[in-house]
Amino acid sequence: MNKYFKVFFFVLLTHALKSSLIFGQATLQKGLSLDIDKDSTATDRLVVKHLDSDKQGYKVYTFKKEGWEYVNVKHVYFGERLLRVGRDNDMRCDFVHYVKVFWKGDVAPFFIKMNYYNWAWVSTRLHFKLNPDLTWTEVTVLTLDENAEQGFTTLFKQKLDEFASQVGDDVLAKYKPFVDDPNKKRFDLKATDEKEETSKKKYVLMVVVVVVFVVVASLVVFLVKFCLK
């Protein structure tokens, strides 16, 4: 009888450790870009992609009253649909324009899709809440000669900047400037790596699960032995 309880305890412990590892990994996803799957039923499903080549050309622009500014996306939280950006100051904007460039084989044309997002400030946390108020636009950029005098990268970035400026002019007509509230507490968004903190939480959870199962298993064994007497 005692042997069966040991086997049962081992199976439960293995399952608990596996579940805690999966749970810990699912709490935080890191990446360099943000995508929204518009074609599936879950239109606001966030997808993080790690980019290794400029040919994939992902950029994120924030539109402020002063103009355009590049923002590097640091963390995406899937469960809460919150986005953290690697900035040293407040990200004060009403629109975010996300440019995604599709590379067809080894040559152009490029297909650029630009999405419009509205940011809502979450006052209790150092994040902005992502509201997928989406407008979808697709344009074709003419083939760029990689051997041109200015170089491929320079021309490509110029095309992106020109395209962003054109869209910005259309948005400006509807733009509502961010209004500062002197009584509102300011938050600073800092570029932080929360992977270490997540790992600590994962291991703490594992320890707690192990302790709980040891106590429960010991209690079950004790009760069985007591009943068999």
Curated annotation (Swiss-Prot):
Primary location group: membrane
GO cellular component, one term: membrane
This protein's record includes keyword Transmembrane helix: yes
Extracellular topological segments: 20-203
Cytoplasmic side: 225-229
Membrane topology: Single-pass membrane protein
TM region(s), chain numbering: 204-224
N-terminal signal peptide: 1-19
Localization (cell): Membrane
Keywords noted in UniProt: Membrane, Signal, Transmembrane, Transmembrane helix
Keyword tRNA processing carried by entry: no
Record-given protein name: 23 kDa piroplasm membrane protein
Taxonomic source organism: Theileria annulata
